Amino acid sequence: GLSSAWRLAEVLTEAGEQVEGRIVVLDKAGIASGASGIACGVVRNNYFQPAMRNLMAHSIKVWESDPKGLSYHPVGYMQVSCEAMHEDVAQIYSEQKSIQYESVFIEGAAASSKYMKVLFDDWQAQGITSVLHEKLGGYANNTTSMYGLAKKAEELGVRIITGVEVKGFTFESSSKAIRTVETDNGSISCKHVIIGAGPWVRNFWDMLALPKKIDVKDLDHNLHKDVDMWRFWQLEEGLLQVDPEILKTNDGKVPPVIHVDTDAPLYSDVDGSLITEEMWGI
């Protein structure tokens, strides 16, 4: 939502048009109070869908346009994987090359270990047979970057109203065009509406009386009827509190963001007991 407002304001400004009073952002609570403020903050291009990869290549250019203002750290990203993921990661690398996205792909257990030990001489992960090292990307400090986005939008004349909850929409008669946005603080007339609600998009889908069930055609062209439009999976994430200094590279620098997936057995460093023999990641 904030990035859309920022870009729309840029378009109007470049065209010599007034922004104030024309772009309004409504936020139910406050800036960064939702998923954007608590998600992992990783900026990467490690996606299987080509469309997503092109989108992220574009987005990283935006991050790079103002690292300080957006609290962005361009340290790069690494996908360190076991053999079960080798083919898929190789395809991602191939498609990254096709859009001139800078990355390095290391294959083979010995070559992967050698590559990682250039960064960390005490590297000891087991079962690794490939490393995809994206030279672009890195991470951003979530809340700070969201406030940076808000600042960019407001400086161009965008009005951000917090503490306002959208309750529904009023449509033009005999039309699907939205005439007003109904909030718990009154109605706002508008010409266009952008819904940037993240995981809460289902609520707005229902407000717009859009279908709860859809038909989906799979890759083999089989049609699956009456599939739920929205399905939510519960994801549990954990944070490990460690001294940042112990994760520096051999030359004392901040390392890339590193994601390791392996099927090597995971043992407790407390009592040596087996935690899992299934694939796990960190």
Q: Can you say where each PLM-predicted feature lies in the sequence?
A:
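Flavin (FAD/FMN) cofactor-binding and adjacent substrate-gating region
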Residues: 65, 84-162, 167-177, 182
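Alpha-helical packing segments of well-folded alpha/beta enzyme cores
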Residues: 55, 59-63, 145, 149, ...
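Flavin-dependent oxidoreductases
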Residues: 3, 44, 169-282
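Beta1/beta-strand and adjacent pyrophosphate-binding region of the FAD-binding site
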Residues: 1, 24
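Fold-independent oxyanion-binding glycine-rich loops
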Residues: 28-29, 135-136, 163-164, 184, ...
